[in-house]
Amino acid sequence: MKQQLDSSQLLAMLDSSKLLVVCGSGGVGKTTMSAALGALAATHLHKKVLVLTVDPARRLADALGLQAIGNAVVQVDAMAFNEAGVAPQGQLFAAMIDTKASWDDLIHRHAPTPAIAQRVLANALYTNLTERFVHSHDYIAMERLYDVYQSGAYDLVVVDTPPSRNALDVLDAPKRMRDFFNSRLLQLLTTPAQSRVVSLMSKPFFQVADRILGARFLSSITEFFTLFRTMEKGFVERANKVENVLRNTDTKFAVVTTLEVAPAFEAEYLLTELQSRSFSLAALIANRVLPLTLANQTSAALTNDRSLVGPETLQTAAAAAGLPTPSAEQCERVLATLWRAAQDVVAASVVEQSRLDKLSHSCSKSGANVLTAQYVSGEITDMKGIVALGESLSGI
């Protein structure tokens, strides 16, 4: 049976975290929940909290009431909290990743010389990869996460990841970067022409690539990856450091879901994958759950004799409100519709509870908090709604 979570438990989890990575499938309210967790920490804890979104949909700005958001960190005005009816003890900041600008910074940092950095930045393939290749966003997300974590500028960083399995792409990005530098493809593209043996072995590859891509484009590819390989040491060392941060004791993970079929299935998958990667799972948050009191009251009402509420009840209510008196037939149709709707509410609540129980069981070994947020009609687009969402979290 669901009980109100001791707020100190939730705040203790936030207080003990330096990095909170929020995962979930699309459409479950993950971005808003990330903001709500950040706002909750900033409200009750004396902390500088940063909410960092790597979600390409870029919805966090609207939810936090900011005019613009990007690589630059923007502070959420304390007045926004005051208008939501709370006085924050800490501070809340928000930022989102500009993939191209972040890659440019990374190239300048890892290139052995400024001249090589400029050659990489000027390469046409570099521009195409950083602007269009989805996994370039994954890797740079981890770089940005690591930067803000290591800077020590914030006491807590809440990271809003892309939807569901894309979140795992982000978390696996450091390993993919390390594997890339060890890949056969990179060796083929960057092997010196003077190496006769290797050149003969790779000749079929280049003949096919030349026909498909054209000599000029192939030359551009070879130049880019040859230059990129000069930065191998810096990238590999950084990838190792990022992986270590993700497994630190003060790095926690939270999975957000709704209790519909597909999101609940994805949440089950995420829980399994996160635990198999030995990440610290701190919370499962079921969002937009039917209020238990509503389901209980509706269930109790359905146990009453249907005949106790007849057309006369509605006709009397209409007369008291000064409305035209409905016919007995109209009243029967309305009552039948209400009765079916009430049955649907109870049935939906039973299904939700079953799915929540299953997810709770999946969390039992990790000791993660299982939290719920009740269904709210309409979209949350301001700090008042964000603060209310964070404050409404309850446990089971």
Regions found by a protein language model. Name each.
Residues 1-14, 211-226, 236-396:
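C-terminal lobe/tail of nucleotide-utilizing enzymes
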Residues 1-21, 25-28, 33-240:
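Nucleotide-state-sensitive switch-loop elements of NTP-binding domains
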